[in-house]
């Protein structure tokens, strides 16, 4: 029993759990269990009363709801590190911002260069700009204490800025319409959170209440609802009025739910991609090449190059006691686009099979390549 407890509480176990549920989802989707798997996650669940109801399929409740809690955790960790930890220095926090910019601009340019002559294909230019923070973190968890905290923090920070960039891209280029009323309600909720923070109120139930209203308004606004988690994290106080740690305690309570329940469930719901109708030859189509080269090469080169230039111009600095060799390994992991890229793919091509699933296959290939190469590289490099 002690051995099982030790294994479950180890740093690598959450990563193993995530990988296990990823392959379980692929197995279910590509076997006789496919119909049961699809029906289960597409089953509608309705929450509400009288004239106010939210009805969504289970996979959307997970992707829009539970993942907002994951983003809340990441936001809390980032806030703590910026105010009290390793990112207090402006040059330290600017590094992931430059990395995120490079990781979005370079893949997009690669995709555009390959697909510029095909109007419909060009709708997918943003597909290789995304990083799946959940899976990238999962690979880091597998490496355990081999990766310094400062590098883990860099990846988390970069992925947040990257996902914020993705949310802006979705809002500007892939949202049919925005609801003005819902956005006004969002602003009122943000003002309420600001007041709670200003008066140093540490009743978690009040933050939950305002947070739920903010999440619903965000959902109805047309902006991706997971952004609500990041916004809430900005306003949770660091300490109580008696100067006792508060934010850290909230993070400690939420973290087990995220790593042992939310992330594995997210992997199981999203990794189920039917690869039976995909043809390996379609990997060499322009759309596929744009996605694969954009995610696998564009991401790592863009992140590293932008960071390197920023460091040389003294606009940012490399984390303490970290060499460029190890740093490059983290840059490789940013090419894991997986569920975030699949999400943008669905918005760009409206789930069309015009490319015979070559786009989805390319996302899988590039993401697995980035994960495997990044893992091996970080395992070898000292």
UniProtKB/Swiss-Prot annotation:
GO terms for molecular function: sodium:proton antiporter activity. It catalyses: Na(+)(in) + 2 H(+)(out) = Na(+)(out) + 2 H(+)(in). The keyword Endoplasmic reticulum does not apply. It comes from the Bacteria. Keywords: Antiport, Cell inner membrane, Cell membrane, Ion transport, Membrane, Sodium, Sodium transport, Transmembrane, Transmembrane helix, Transport. It is a multi-pass membrane protein. GO terms for cellular component: plasma membrane. The chain crosses the membrane at residues 7-27, 58-78, 94-114, 124-144, 153-173, 178-198, 199-219, 255-275, 291-311, 327-347, 361-381. It holds the Pfam family Na_H_antiport_1. The keyword Ion transport applies. Na(+)/H(+) antiporter that extrudes sodium in exchange for external protons. Belongs to the NhaA Na(+)/H(+) (TC 2.A.33) antiporter family. This is Na(+)/H(+) antiporter NhaA 2. It comes from Campylobacter jejuni subsp. jejuni serotype O:2 (strain ATCC 700819 / NCTC 11168).
